[in-house]
């Protein structure tokens, strides 16, 4: 079962009902005297949370090492402690502004060093109204960056520069970095895209440049975002 956490589990369990796909798979699993049901996924959380009584909790787990272009689960979920790349929103005074400034900073380093794209993904909810709310917040914070270009924004972007530690490319000079950051906000070169069942977004729209992409489950199924950084 490829992407075994998507449709195979009982998605109606909280309503005391059984989803059709889960019911049919149960019939297949239980219809033979012996069988192996192999579940494959890169996001196994829902499978691990199944009870043994449900028949959907794995009896064994095999973990594949990540390929050369992937960081792997251990990078984001170490056995102890909090990874340095993770920040909890509850601990940030203005989380949306912080994310916008950080992404502009990272995008400036990438684009100034010859990179093509820097994408930032927002998955706040499955509700489309929430997607619009966050898109408006991001646009508001970008406008703040423009209004405070030579003041607070410049101070914040300089602080972020000192925190950058790129590993694939050399760190560009501060002047190059700042010039690119100003280009992004002055030239209205930052895209804010909503991706859900209500909007039609082409992959070419997030293949280049500095982008914020907001959506729900659409972001995690059948779509690949190049240069996905946060």
Residue ranges and their predicted role:
Residues 1, 5-6, 10-112, 119-121, ...:
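Conserved P-loop NTPase catalytic core
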Residues 12, 49-54, 133-138, 225-230:
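Composition- and surface-driven signal marking solvent-exposed, interaction-prone regions
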Residues 211-215, 219-230:
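A short beta-strand element within the Helicase C-terminal
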Residues 25-26, 51, 202-203, 218-220:
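Catalytic micro-motifs at enzyme active sites that drive phosphoryl/nucleotidyl and oxygen chemistry
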Residues 26-35, 113-114, 144-148, 223-226:
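Secondary-structure transition/capping motifs at alpha-helix termini
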Residues 1-4, 11-14, 113-212:
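Conserved C-terminal RecA-like helicase domain
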Residues 23, 179, 216-217:
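Residue-level marker for well-ordered alpha-helical positions
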């Amino acid at each position: 079962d490829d992407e075994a956490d998507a449709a195979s589990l009982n998605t109606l369990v909280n309503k005391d009902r059984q989803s059709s796909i889960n019911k049919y798979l149960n019939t297949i699993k239980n219809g033979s005297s012996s069988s192996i049901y192999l579940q494959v996924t890169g996001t196994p959380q829902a499978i691990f949370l199944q009870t043994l009584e449900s028949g959907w909790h794995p009896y064994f787990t095999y973990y594949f090492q990540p390929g050369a272009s992937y960081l792997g689960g251990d990078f984001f979920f170490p056995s102890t402690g909090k990874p340095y790349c993770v920040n909890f929103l509850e601990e940030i005074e203005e989380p949306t502004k912080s994310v916008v400034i950080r992404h502009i900073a990272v995008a400036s380093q990438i684009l100034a060093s010859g990179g093509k794209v820097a994408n930032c993904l927002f998955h706040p909810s499955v509700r489309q109204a929430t997607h619009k709310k966050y898109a408006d917040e991001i646009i508001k914070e970008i406008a703040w960056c423009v209004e405070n270009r030579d003041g607070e924004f410049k101070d914040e972007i300089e602080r972020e520069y000192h925190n950058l530690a790129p590993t694939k490319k050399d760190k560009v000079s501060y002047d190059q970095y700042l010039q690119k950051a100003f280009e992004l906000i002055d030239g209205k070169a930052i895209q804010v895209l909503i991706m859900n069942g209500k909007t039609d977004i082409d992959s070419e729209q997030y293949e280049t440049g500095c982008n914020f992409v907001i959506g729900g489950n659409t972001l995690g199924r059948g779509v690949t975002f190049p240069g996905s950084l946060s």
